[in-house]
């Protein structure tokens, strides 16, 4: 993978002391020692808590010391080969991006390019050796690396594509001089290289077929570091393909994953949420509403059970998922677990009613899509040296969402047919046509459309995410016998098991 180097600066001990407070130096040395000793508990403490505490104490309104000073500090102490020297820039630039939204810290084009270079250097550090690195890092840190790598790629694409006056001629020149910086092909290759090195697909395939994954893995596959990097890179690829609008490819990436036994991805809650959200959205856009329901409902139940101090707080993402669930429910109602249905109606009940009634449906669909859909990306510009003539990302989002809205409008009309069919067991075509203000030939065409739209590919347990069986997914089925419609309404008996499990889960959670 491409990497550009810059002229090294001569850093003296005086420079280090002037830019890195002594207490911060001690903290970084302690952090480095924890990594060298492979003490995951100590690493987690430094990564999760002490970093935040040190930031608040010394760098509340400013940046951490630049990576060159930290590198020089460890070189002065004869530890230039320390893993921490390669890991620190990732922490540094992630902190810059995070705090740019609520401080006076600004991200420059130089920052964006430098962060890209450090990420490529870091990924090369993992994939280039012939033997696994003698390194252990917490799963959350590994996920955060992949998550931040993709976030910064998305942010760069948005920044480069934005039509505004914030970018100067110098910015455009810097971007043009580095055409491969944050190039989508290089980003994809970086994730694929981690997946290949980790042998994660081979292990997942073995697991699905009932074999021992460890026996299928080589030295890299047996390393926890590489195994988790491979897992998280798979989820990152799903996310990236989803943002690029390639929904089938996003599902194909997970071909070796049993979606009903995905415990390895739940080791980091944020990773688990990302996987469910992006796969669910892909199913939604592919008109596989039943599968979307299943994933959205499952993750909302899991998120509810992990609330509380010390747990992942995905409030914003939860609301986003609820919007997509409400959208799918409005178009094709399904039976939901009681607590999920209550949450959905509480937050988006009004929009559901608007869509199902047809009054204000366009406004409600727009609201749910804009709040629930991911940010679509168009990673290429006609001329990187010139400001774009239009907001290409907005245009791409409008194109993707318009495709879904066309489908939604058809389903809303079919929903009106469903509401009449549920009231009868037999009904004359002419009678229903009068209710709908249609001719009988028009109604016949609509009934054919109803049958087609309600027949969907549904994932089969243990099968690949993209595969499935065609099933009729509506609660109302019918056939036309001459000039009469024969209707069968399928009802599901109330299951008290769900209520019992939900109450038990709440009791366990409240007693923690």
From Swiss-Prot:
Keywords: Cytoplasm, Initiation factor, Protein biosynthesis. Residues 291-477 form the PCI domain. HAMAP family: eIF3l. PANTHER family: EUKARYOTIC TRANSLATION INITIATION FACTOR 3, EUKARYOTIC TRANSLATION INITIATION FACTOR 3 SUBUNIT L. It is found in: Cytoplasm. GO terms for molecular function: translation initiation factor activity. The lineage of its organism: Eukaryota, Choanoflagellata, Craspedida, Salpingoecidae, Monosiga. Its main location: cytoplasm. It comes from the Eukaryota. Belongs to the eIF-3 subunit L family. Component of the eukaryotic translation initiation factor 3 (eIF-3) complex. One of its GO terms (biological process) is translational initiation. It holds the Pfam family Paf67. This is Eukaryotic translation initiation factor 3 subunit L. It comes from Monosiga brevicollis. InterPro entries: eIF3l, PCI_dom. Component of the eukaryotic translation initiation factor 3 (eIF-3) complex, which is involved in protein synthesis of a specialized repertoire of mRNAs and, together with other initiation factors, stimulates binding of mRNA and methionyl-tRNAi to the 40S ribosome. The eIF-3 complex specifically targets and initiates translation of a subset of mRNAs involved in cell proliferation. One of its GO terms (cellular component) is eukaryotic 48S preinitiation complex.
């Amino acid at each position: 993978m491409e990497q550009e180097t810059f002229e090294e600066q001569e850093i003296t001990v005086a420079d280090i002391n002037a830019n890195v407070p002594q207490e911060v130096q001690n903290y970084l040395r302690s952090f480095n020692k924890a990594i060298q000793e492979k003490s995951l508990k100590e690493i987690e403490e430094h990564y999760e808590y002490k970093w935040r505490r040190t930031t608040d104490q010394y760098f509340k309104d400013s940046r951490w010391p630049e990576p060159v000073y930290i590198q020089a500090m460890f070189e002065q102490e004869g530890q230039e080969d320390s893993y921490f020297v390669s890991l620190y820039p990732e922490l540094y630039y992630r902190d810059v991006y995070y705090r740019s939204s609520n401080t006076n810290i600004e991200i420059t084009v130089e920052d964006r390019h430098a962060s890209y270079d450090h990420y490529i250097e870091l990924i090369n550090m993992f994939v280039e050796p012939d033997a696994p690195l003698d390194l252990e890092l917490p799963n959350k840190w590994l996920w955060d690396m992949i998550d931040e790598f993709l976030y910064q790629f998305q942010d760069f694409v948005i920044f480069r594509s934005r039509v505004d006056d914030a970018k100067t001629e110098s910015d455009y020149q810097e971007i043009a001089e580095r055409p491969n910086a944050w190039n989508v092909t290089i980003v994809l290759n970086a994730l694929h290289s981690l997946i290949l090195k980790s042998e994660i697909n081979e292990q997942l395939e073995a697991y699905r077929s009932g074999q021992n994954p460890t026996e299928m893995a080589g030295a890299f596959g047996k390393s926890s570091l590489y195994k988790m990097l491979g897992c998280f890179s798979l989820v990152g690829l799903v996310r990236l393909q989803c943002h690029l609008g390639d929904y089938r490819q996003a599902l194909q990436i997970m071909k070796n994953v049993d979606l009903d036994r995905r415990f390895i991805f739940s080791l980091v809650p944020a990773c688990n949420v990302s996987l469910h959200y992006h796969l669910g959205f892909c199913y939604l856009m592919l008109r596989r509403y039943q599968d979307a329901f299943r994933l959205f409902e499952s993750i909302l139940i899991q998120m509810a059970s992990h609330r509380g101090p010390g747990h992942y707080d995905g409030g914003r993402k939860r609301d986003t998922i609820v919007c997509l669930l409400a959208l799918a429910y409005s178009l094709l109602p399904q039976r939901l677990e009681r607590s999920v249905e209550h949450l959905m109606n509480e937050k988006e009940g009004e929009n559901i009613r608007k869509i199902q009634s047809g009054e204000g449906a366009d406004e409600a669909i727009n609201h749910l899509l804009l709040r629930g859909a991911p940010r679509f990306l168009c990673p290429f510009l006609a001329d990187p040296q010139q400001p774009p003539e239009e907001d290409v990302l907005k245009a791409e989002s409008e194109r993707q969402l318009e495709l879904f809205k066309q489908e939604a409008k058809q389903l809303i009309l079919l929903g009106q047919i469903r509401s009449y069919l549920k009231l009868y067991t037999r009904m004359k075509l002419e009678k229903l046509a009068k209710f709908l203000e249609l001719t009988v030939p028009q109604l016949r065409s609509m009934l054919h459309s109803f049958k087609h739209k309600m027949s969907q590919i549904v994932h089969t347990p243990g099968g690949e995410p993209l595969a499935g069986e065609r099933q009729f997914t509506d609660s109302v089925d019918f056939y036309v016998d001459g000039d009469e419609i024969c209707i069968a309404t399928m009802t599901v008996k109330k299951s008290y098991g769900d209520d019992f499990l939900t109450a038990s889960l709440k009791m366990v959670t409240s007693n923690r």
